[in-house]
Amino acid sequence: LKCVNLQANGVKMTQECAKEDTKCLTLRSLKKTLKFCASDRICKTMKIASLPGEQITCCEGNMCNA
């Protein structure tokens, strides 16, 4: 599952969402890969434009090593 144009530090990147049960997402740009994982913070649920009605949990904050 992929959704695009995610704003991360003002830079548009391609977002690759992992399995829902991991509550992690990976951000990939040309020069770096960042991975964000959920913990006790509130997560937001995003609809993926190319898959209407399907939702996946994507989280902000608590950056972990790729």
Curated annotation (Swiss-Prot):
Lineage top rank: taxon: Eukaryota
Keyword terms, alphabetized: Amphibian defense peptide, Disulfide bond, Secreted
Protein task: Lacks alpha-neurotoxic activity, has apparently no antibacterial activity, nor anti-coagulant potency.
Keyword DNA damage: no
Disulfide bonds: C3-C24, C17-C37, C43-C58, C59-C64
Lineage: Eukaryota, Metazoa, Chordata, Craniata, Vertebrata
Location relative to the cell: Secreted
Source organism: Xenopus laevis
GO cellular component, one term: extracellular region
Tissue: Expressed by the skin dorsal glands.
Record GO biological process: defense response
Record-given protein name: Xenoxin-3
Chief location bin: secreted
